[in-house]
Curated annotation (Swiss-Prot):
GO terms for biological process: innate immune response; proteolysis. The clip domain consists of 35-55 residues which are 'knitted' together usually by 3 conserved disulfide bonds forming a clip-like compact structure. Its main location: secreted. This is CLIP domain-containing serine protease B4. In females, expressed in fat body, cuticle, thorax and ovaries. SUPFAM superfamilies: Trypsin-like serine proteases. Disulfide bonds join C31-C82, C41-C72, C47-C83, C138-C154, C280-C297, C307-C336. The lineage of its organism: Eukaryota, Metazoa, Ecdysozoa, Arthropoda, Hexapoda. It comes from Anopheles gambiae.
Length: 360
């Protein structure tokens, strides 16, 4: 094991790569991290999320930039960093970067099955059917130890006699009881009973524009994070909420229908370009659908889209080393993956206050 002094020298060298001026804050002072989230200026070794990023087998340029820009001062020649995401007492909190949106590997290549530990916040919603059978027909995203975020239509627009039954986390291959990739064996997925479901009060089943298509599911217990189960970040700060994503690359992941119209057994991912909602509105207006700023669009390239089995699942972007949930899969063209018609997503940034008001 490398001595503390050597580790500190390595950290200082890594954090100095960008050559930027370090804020001269004192130990314990309030600070703001690179993505605009509030934190405390602490010793590097006391900020476990940053230590975890530093200790990853391979650091991406975003990782290095985030580490560099997290510096906030020096204390007795030791590096201080702005550490965000301290959990508030008495109420379930939402994690902030770098306590969320981190996966052990950065191997995103669009249009392929995921690796076993990619996007560990993806969830499956299981339904109980009248014939005594069960099935997974919607997705969601882990946002902390007690909740997933999903689409309202996954709760209210389901066939007669169906009931939302449980939530599964840590899944990768539905055809296997033990997920394995190369020499890595994942822990068994967990099935969680549901304590409460909160559908946005503004969602109207009869509204074909699907405004306010967002819901929360609360587990009956807290979960423990692992390499295959963790939370994705939400855009909590004003700077993140106001960020424009149009024209930029994003990713969706889930077990939905493929271009062959059959559900995938393994978790899939697809790279999608975000489209300004004003630019994709005309494609839907002819069908009497009116989109607004609480929605966003992505995709529109033949064969690259999210399909019905992915409803409620995540649309995400990696920013400053962490993955952020920017959209929830809502609806799309009648023919999935139709060219020129992007899919529609609930714009998560518009619902951060609602989410914060409804978790406990």
């Amino acid at each position: 094991m490398i001595g503390n002094r050597v580790i500190n020298l390595l950290i200082v060298a890594t954090l100095a790569l960008a050559g930027q001026t370090v804020l001269a804050l004192e130990l314990g002072q309030d600070c703001v991290n690179p993505v605009g989230e509030a934190g405390k200026c602490v010793l590097f070794r006391e900020c476990q999320p940053l230590v975890d990023i530093y200790n990853k087998p391979v650091n991406t340029p975003d990782d290095t930039q985030f580490l560099t820009e997290s510096r906030c001062g020096l204390y007795e020649r030791k590096t201080l960093v702005c550490c965000a995401g301290v959990r508030s007492k008495g109420k379930t909190s939402l994690p902030e970067s770098p306590n969320c949106g981190v996966q052990l590997t950065d191997r995103v290549i669009g249009g392929q099955p995921t690796k076993i530990d990619e996007f560990p916040w993806t969830a499956l919603i299981e339904y109980e059917k009248p014939n005594g059978r069960f099935g997974f027909h919607c997705g969601g995203s882990v946002i902390n130890e007690r909740y997933i975020l999903t689409a309202a239509h996954c709760i209210t627009s389901i066939p007669r006699g169906w009931k939302v039954h449980r939530v599964r986390l840590g899944e990768w291959d539905l055809s296997s009881t033990t997920d394995q990739e190369d020499d890595f064996y994942a822990d068994a997925p967990i099935d969680l009973d549901i304590e409460k479901i909160i559908v946005h009060p503004g969602y109207n089943l009869q509204d074909k524009s699907h405004h306010n298509d967002i819901a929360l599911i609360r587990f009956n217990r807290e979960i423990n994070y692992s390499s295959t189960i963790s939370a994705i970040c939400l855009p909590l700060s004003n700077s993140l909420r106001n960020r424009k994503h149009a024209g930029l690359s994003s990713y969706a992941a889930g077990w939905g229908k493929t271009e062959t119209a059959s559900a995938s057994q393994k978790k899939l991912k697809v790279e999608l370009t975000v489209v300004d909602v004003k630019d994709c509105s005309p494609a839907y207006q002819r069908n009497g659908i009116s989109l607004d700023s609480t929605q966003m669009c992505a995709g529109g390239i033949r064969g690259k889209d999210t399909c019905s089995g992915d409803s409620g699942g995540p649309l995400m972007r990696q920013m400053s080393g962490s993955w952020y949930l920017i959209g929830v899969v809502s609806f799309g063209p009648q023919k999935c993956g139709a060219p020129g018609v992007p899919g529609v997503y609930t714009n998560v940034a518009e619902y951060v206050d609602w989410i914060k008001d409804n978790i406990y």
